[in-house]
Amino acid sequence: MSKRKITKVNNLNFEPFDRYGKVIPGMTWHKISFDKETNYGTYISKLEPGTKTIPHIHMGYEEFFILEGELIDSDGTIFKKGDLVTFEPGTKHSSHTKKGCLILTFMRGENKRIKEK
């Protein structure tokens, strides 16, 4: 018996994004295979225009693919539709979006909150 799961990107049930213990205003997510205990898995996040993420450090790898819109990293790099981005363990950053975006994320470890610079 197959244990296949098909996720229809145009028909998702988004919930408030609460990975860091508090909800980030303007950010929601749809968990595909994400496990909050291990911080491993896949999810799709939606950021409304003007949304800012919480500064954090990557304890494991995180990769994401921009499905729609664009995301601006704390160093000014702009990630656009079609970009696949890899953050290695030890990376510290935060991001924001002016236009909004939809992101497919692959997590392999915890992100820990850090204080803003």
Where are these regions (language model features)?
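A short, N-terminal "cap"/entry segment at the start of jelly-roll beta-barrel domains
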Residues: 1-38
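Ligand-binding loop in jelly-roll beta-barrel domains
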Residues: 89-114
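Glycine- and acidic-residue-biased ligand/ion/polar-headgroup-sensing regions
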Residues: 58-74
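Short acidic-glycine-tyrosine-enriched beta hairpin
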Residues: 73-92
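Short glycine/proline-enriched turns and hinge-like loops at secondary-structure junctions
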Residues: 57-59, 77-78, 97-99
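Conserved short histidine dyad/triad with adjacent acidic residue
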Residues: 28-58, 88-92
